[in-house]
Amino acid sequence: MKALLIAAGVAALSSTAMAAKLDEKVPYPKADAGFTRQVIHLPKQDTEDAFKVEIIAGKTLEADCNQQRLGGELEEHTLEGWGYSYYRLDKVSGPMSTMMACPGQKKEQRFIPVVGEGFLLRYNSKLPIVVYAPKDVEVRYRIWSASEKVEKAVSE
């Protein structure tokens, strides 16, 4: 009987923790039909102005030796009444590809990125980066950092 009560307590606590995690995303809207809401939580940095976040959205597709890209634009929106930003990738076009011959090479599954405007964001660990993307699009990210070394331009 004790084991049953303990198991019920653990189940209740774990479901409460899952609900609390979902509430952390509030007040961001739920994803529209056919879209997912993907969230990035960044670690705190001492000098966050020296960092950028590159959003790398894409699909895993069968590809040959050619360079392939998808097209799209990551649009910034503001959450009314809060001033928080969130991002939406509405349309993904392509794939576009170079046209080299690939004799004897098999196609393989590769991550093909979406290229376009709006994918480089400022770094802010205080707020999550919330991206709404089509269900078949995976959102990845990369952190960029500036060098401490600053060069001086030459007058000519």
Swiss-Prot record:
Record GO terms (molecular function): serine-type endopeptidase inhibitor activity
Localization terms from the record: Periplasm
UniProt keyword list: Disulfide bond, Periplasm, Protease inhibitor, Serine protease inhibitor, Signal
Site (Reactive bond): 99-100
Protein name, UniProt field: Ecotin
Disulfide bond found in the keyword field: yes
Annotated Gene3D superfamilies: Ecotin, Ecotin, trypsin inhibitor
Record text on subunit structure and interactions: Homodimer.
Lineage, uppermost ranks: Bacteria, Pseudomonadati, Pseudomonadota, Gammaproteobacteria, Pseudomonadales
